[in-house]
Design a protein with these regions (language model features):
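Acyl-donor binding region in acyl/amide transferases
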Residues: 81-167, 287-365
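Acyltransferase donor/substrate-recognition loop-hinge adjacent to the catalytic core
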Residues: 148-230
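A conserved beta-strand-loop-helix scaffold within acyl/acetyltransferase catalytic domains
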Residues: 20-62, 70-80, 206, 211-317
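Extended hydrophobic-aromatic, low-complexity segments
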Residues: 231, 256-261, 268-270, 278-284, ...
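Extreme N-terminal starter segment of soluble prokaryotic enzymes
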Residues: 2-3
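Conserved donor-binding loop and adjoining core beta-sheet/short helix segment
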Residues: 33-147, 251, 261-262, 266-279, ...
Length: 388
């Protein structure tokens, strides 16, 4: 018999975290630890974040054994900004049983509908800024750092329940970070970029640990200006961005975090994240969480890190739309690729990229014969509101 109950106690939360051990048992690409710190982003987030987001977590049990989980999310800041009556679900994990899936999704939908929300979208973890969608590729692979990983049957769970895919986004893999310029047909583009760089007054600097708060505010402002017209946008708060940066700092290489400035004013930002999952996979066999973290960080920080971590995820390309220099995005990409080459990285993956986003339409990806390496999907379903 399947039962679904709301998470209430510390023991419930411990069982919530343990669901992944059951779901991913035998998955060769599964990493033993959650990609996000659930305590900091879900269970006990900072007050400033908790005040803008109401959640209800649910556990599914079969004969007393936990077999699935889900979180219903009412992002009040999103509702207030967009005026849209949409709730979200996320952190979905379940065994391959449609009765379990139905029970979990029914519970999340009922909670959102009771709050007057007319649709449910997801999965988000807990918002689009952190993690969004599920992998829908037929070929499983080691997840890219910060991106989703899930059993392929999740799509069937969602679709059978009535969720419909509403947005796809992709990652693009380049086995050589300078492939854009090394291909003969792009030699001319490289010459153009060099000429633009020579006459451009745009300068670059890396984010600094001692000024991370100030730089976080700069990145927040650039994000909110850049993505204001993007699908699913709502303004990002400083607290939320800063919390994410704090979680990422141990694995970031600040030489790959670029701020572009023009006349002393910030006009762009681009971040490359070393694919720490490659190091985490090396430590996955260890039983102790702290030992896994220690070994992973050792691989991340050692001088010969690229022996294990040869890849970089390119994320967070923000350019001030009011910047008079229209070459900033190209210059940022070129500068990052040169730094990756000099540091010894030989693989780069750009993700997430919306296929219909303004950035995609204007980016160098549209001028390349490049097909998506991975596909992620977000789903939606209208809800029936309870009668008065």
């Amino acid at each position: 018999m399947i039962t679904v109950d709301r998470v209430e106690s510390t023991q419930d939360w411990n069982e919530f975290k343990a669901v992944t051990d059951l779901v991913y048992q035998g998955d060769p690409y599964r990493l033993p630890d959650e990609p996000m710190d659930l305590d900091r982003i879900l269970i006990s987030p900072p007050v400033a974040i908790a005040s803008t987001r109401d959640i209800a977590a649910f556990l599914a049990r079969e004969n007393g054994v936990v077999v699935g989980r889900v979180v219903a999310i009412h992002d009040t800041s999103f509702t207030q900004y967009t005026g849209e009556s949409i709730g979200f679900f996320g952190f979905y994990e379940a065994v391959d049983d449609h009765e379990v899936a139905t029970g979990l999704l029914d519970a999340a939908a009922a909670w959102l509908a009771a709050r007057g929300l007319g649709a449910m979208s997801g999965p988000f973890g807990p918002s689009m800024f952190y993690s969004a969608g599920i992998v829908v590729d037929d070929e499983p692979a080691l997840p890219l750092v910060g991106m989703p990983h899930n059993p392929l049957y999740y799509a069937a769970h969602f679709e059978k329940w009535g969720l419909v895919g509403i947005k796809d986004f992709y990652s693009y893999l380049f086995d050589d970070p300078c492939v854009i310029y090394n291909r003969p047909e792009y030699a001319r583009h490289m010459q153009i970029f060099e000429k633009i760089k020579a006459r451009s007054e745009v300068t670059f600097r890396s984010m600094k640990y001692r000024t991370v708060r100030r730089d976080a505010r700069i990145v927040r402002d650039l994000y909110n200006k850049t993505f204001v017209n993007f699908w699913g946008f709502s303004p990002l708060s400083f607290v939320e961005l800063f919390e994410l940066l704090k979680m990422m700092l141990p694995v970031l290489d600040r030489r790959l975090t670029l701020l572009a400035e023009l006349d002393g004013k910030p006009v762009g930002f681009l971040m490359g994240i070393p694919d720490v999952n490659q190091a985490a996979a090396k430590a996955a066999h260890l039983k102790s969480r702290w030992l896994r973290d220690l070994v992973t960080l050792w691989h991340v920080k050692k001088p010969s890190r690229t022996d294990v971590i040869d890849g970089v995820r390119v994320d967070m390309l923000f350019v001030d739309p009011d910047c008079p220099d229209r070459a900033v995005s190209s210059l940022l990409i070129m500068e990052l690729s040169v730094r990756m080459r000099d540091l010894g990285y030989t693989r780069v993956e750009a993700a997430p990229v919306l296929d219909d986003s303004p950035w995609m339409k204007g980016s160098v990806l549209t001028r390349m014969e490049q097909t998506p390496h991975r596909t992620y999907r977000i789903y939606n379903r209208d809800l029936e509101l309870p009668r008065p």
